[in-house]
């Protein structure tokens, strides 16, 4: 017992020394050109143009013909979702997609919010911009940039947007009313893909910062999960004076002494200040971290090395694309869904919502360019980019959803984000928080902004 206390005290001192070395620095803003060919000498067109999602008979006919040629491989007996997407359940998805899913109706739903495009660094950047339908007298809306990840899209935010822009109509306080901007990452959905190598999270952060200033915002809030978390983090590192607050539901925590401490075992976890909830979500460590990462990172290795190869297959087969993406919406929502014959997909999402996200990738042909984002960010290795070793010095809020791929305790988050002012253990939910639990996420964003406004 005494030995454990002494060791824990020594570890605590080392951790305190490590955490207290707060060096405030900013990420260089830089510039870039990602369009085809050389950057033209003429000034880039900075106009903002309305955009509408459209479809055609030819597009739908081609989709149906490809779906009709779906060739299923029988799953192994009792395999459920342990081998990936179960082809027996895929038959149900395919039948619904072919016979009941109404893409024209879904296009109308996509167009319920105003869409725009604008040229930034040689690329046509797509975004939706939703203003409050009503405001309390004498109040102005708070601008909020929300950034998606992979294999999601701007559509993930469709259910949370009204809770932020029109809270009173949805039973929430109108103390904070937001003006929401949701861009598509370059190479995702309706944003043009780069013609050149190297467009990573830092370049995306700069592009989205330019978008916000082009829209007239000098100070704003930002929120993200998955790649959106890293993009927003980079923006906070790059232009901290413009970011009023950063809210995340996933953290890219660089390897540090602190993140290694759970290896000491569950008993030391309590000595080191981990809460009971942290211990519940981290242990058994081998199963919940090591084995989980091994099971769920196969796609990452492919996309961070040779994304174009698998992309050839996915861009040619809508059913293959659906299997590849929807498997993530199963396991990343809750890992236990691997035990179910249908992957639990319809427990949290409708088939319409899931297929709209697939259709955004399919109709734009952007699965390959979206996968390349892994190569651009991870292809050179880990801890080789300047931003990975930098801390973030803007007010930060964090939503810890219990079924996220890897739990990030408050102590880990605070190492990277010393100005963490809000950390919430969420009641339920997984990786696709805005899509799965929009009300819970909206409430936590509002809680964080209330604290950030006092800073």
Curated annotation (Swiss-Prot):
Transmembrane region(s): 1-21
Keywords: Acetylation, Aromatic hydrocarbons catabolism, Detoxification, Endoplasmic reticulum, Hydrolase, Lipid metabolism, Membrane, Methylation, Microsome, Signal-anchor, Transmembrane, Transmembrane helix
Subcellular localization(s) per the UniProt record: Microsome membrane; Endoplasmic reticulum membrane
Effect after changing residue 404 to D: Increases catalytic activity
GO cellular component entries: endoplasmic reticulum membrane; intracellular membrane-bounded organelle; membrane
Enzyme Commission number(s): 3.3.2.9
Gene3D superfamilies per the UniProt record, alphabetical: alpha/beta hydrolase (3.40.50.1820)
Sequence positions bearing N6-acetyllysine: 439
GO molecular function: cis-stilbene-oxide hydrolase activity; enzyme binding; epoxide hydrolase activity; oxysterol binding
GO BP annotation list: arachidonate metabolic process; cellular response to glucocorticoid stimulus; diol biosynthetic process; epoxide metabolic process; hydrocarbon catabolic process; liver development; response to polycyclic arene; response to toxic substance
Modified positions (Dimethylated arginine) in chain numbering: 295
Catalytic activity: cis-stilbene oxide + H2O = (1R,2R)-hydrobenzoin; 1-(4-methoxyphenyl)-N-methyl-N-[(3-methyloxetan-3-yl)methyl]methanamine + H2O = 2-{[(4-methoxybenzyl)(methyl)amino]methyl}-2-methylpropane-1,3-diol; 8,9-epoxy-(5Z,11Z,14Z)-eicosatrienoate + H2O = 8,9-dihydroxy-(5Z,11Z,14Z)-eicosatrienoate; 11,12-epoxy-(5Z,8Z,14Z)-eicosatrienoate + H2O = 11,12-dihydroxy-(5Z,8Z,14Z)-eicosatrienoate
EC top class named in words: hydrolase
Primary location group: membrane
Activity modulation notes: Inhibited by 10-hydroxystearamide and methoxy-arachidonyl fluorophosphate.
UniProt function note: Biotransformation enzyme that catalyzes the hydrolysis of arene and aliphatic epoxides to less reactive and more water soluble dihydrodiols by the trans addition of water. May play a role in the metabolism of endogenous lipids such as epoxide-containing fatty acids. Metabolizes the abundant endocannabinoid 2-arachidonoylglycerol (2-AG) to free arachidonic acid (AA) and glycerol. Binds 20(S)-hydroxycholesterol (20(S)-OHC).
Protein name: Epoxide hydrolase 1
Species of provenance: Rattus norvegicus
